Amino acid sequence: MERPISEAYFQEAKRHIPGGVSSPVRAFKAVGGTPPFLVRGEGAYVWDADGNRYLDYVMSWGPLILGHAHPKVLARVRETLERGLTFGAPSPLEVALAKKVKRAYPFVDLVRFVNSGTEATMSALRLARGYTGRPYIVKFRGNYHGHADGLLVEAGSGALTLGVPSSAGVPEEYAKLTLVLEYNDPEGLREVLKRRGEEIAAIIFEPVVGNAGVLVPTEDFLKALHEAKAYGVLLIADEVMTGFRLAFGGATELLGLKPDLVTLGKILGGGLPAAAYAGRREIMEKVAPLGPVYQAGTLSGNPLAMAAGLATLELLEENPGYYAYLEDLGARLEAGLKEVLKEKGLPHTVNRVGSMITVFFTEGPVVTFQDARRTDTELFKRFFHGLLDRGIYWPPSNFEAAFLSVAHREEDVEKTLEALRKAL
């Protein structure tokens, strides 16, 4: 599939934008080649500047659970647009969307809207520290919570090693306030809680990991997380990716979690920039203007994003069968991928929860970040480009989830599997 216009755009973009992209994974650094410059989306498909059509499994990295350009979402945004772009003032739409969030997450009393998942997690951690008066946070390897300084850290050797920066520009002294543990290692978590629990403000975690590829929590790991409450540690469920995707109440509903705070994004904005952090009243009342924890934003709660999010959540709430449909379609795709890869004699593990799926090119099981890193990235490049050249747009990294939407059909799954047979 030829993309000369995209190639020209990419070369021009690199003269004006770092790496030619506004987010690193879009540059295809992990897979090589030229990213298609997309100009249109409809349903489960996107089109590039060269006129090529692709079946989309990126779906803007998760927000588009209804598919591209859903007519009801577009209509709500157009209606709102006619009244103005943004006011920097309270609006009825943010009240309506907050009420939807509370219906989806019954433990939530108060919701604060922001503009990105990074803002949501950063603000939730500041709130946790302000509420508890404690300095340390715990995160897990392979869990991504945005690009705030305190979260761009990785583990050293041993469960109690203080975090060290994984990005230039993050002071080591600041990174040391983050303790980084292995995901799905309940005993390691229990050890840290036993020795340092009273210093820890919060544990932030992805209930289902999406940014190391899909990783699924074990029951004992979830149990160990909830044991942290006995030490006065707040649990922050980062549902920026899983919120409203795995169920209307996200992974919290699906897995029966009991967090103190939840962070939301992606689907919450219906395709426009919106995110939120939310939780129990006694914690959220520490946020300004009610309390001493400061957080603000010029475009927070802006009408266009609130309108898109509200229309999306209304459709999800009114059509609970969407989640059963996505589970069935996801199961078909999972089974088909396993069948094709087995036919080809390739090492593989397919991890899936609902409409999130990852193919790892390694023998399973893949339950930790260390397991995920065993994947054969060269084989993934063949997989990715073989699909892309046949009109299937899979995420350009082996450590990202692929997403289904309600716009995908059974014939799209069959088209994907046939393309994979030819590609490999």
Swiss-Prot record:
Q: Which residues carry this modification: N6-(pyridoxal phosphate)lysine?
A: K266
Identify the metabolic or biological route this protein is part of. Answer: Porphyrin-containing compound metabolism; protoporphyrin-IX biosynthesis; 5-aminolevulinate from L-glutamyl-tRNA(Glu): step 2/2
- This protein's major location comes to cytoplasm
Record keywords, A-Z: Cytoplasm, Isomerase, Porphyrin biosynthesis, Pyridoxal phosphate
> What Enzyme Commission number(s) apply to this enzyme?
5.4.3.8
**InterPro entries referenced in this protein's UniProt entry, alphabetically:** 4pyrrol_synth_GluAld_NH2Trfase, Aminotrans_3, Aminotrans_3_PPA_site, PyrdxlP-dep_Trfase, PyrdxlP-dep_Trfase_major, PyrdxlP-dep_Trfase_small
Cofactor(s) the protein requires to work = pyridoxal 5'-phosphate
Q: Which reaction does it catalyse?
A: (S)-4-amino-5-oxopentanoate = 5-aminolevulinate
> What would be one Gene Ontology cellular-component term for the protein?
cytoplasm
- Similarity comment text for this entry: Belongs to the class-III pyridoxal-phosphate-dependent aminotransferase family. HemL subfamily.
What is the annotated quaternary arrangement, including any partners?
Homodimer.
Protein name, UniProt field = Glutamate-1-semialdehyde 2,1-aminomutase
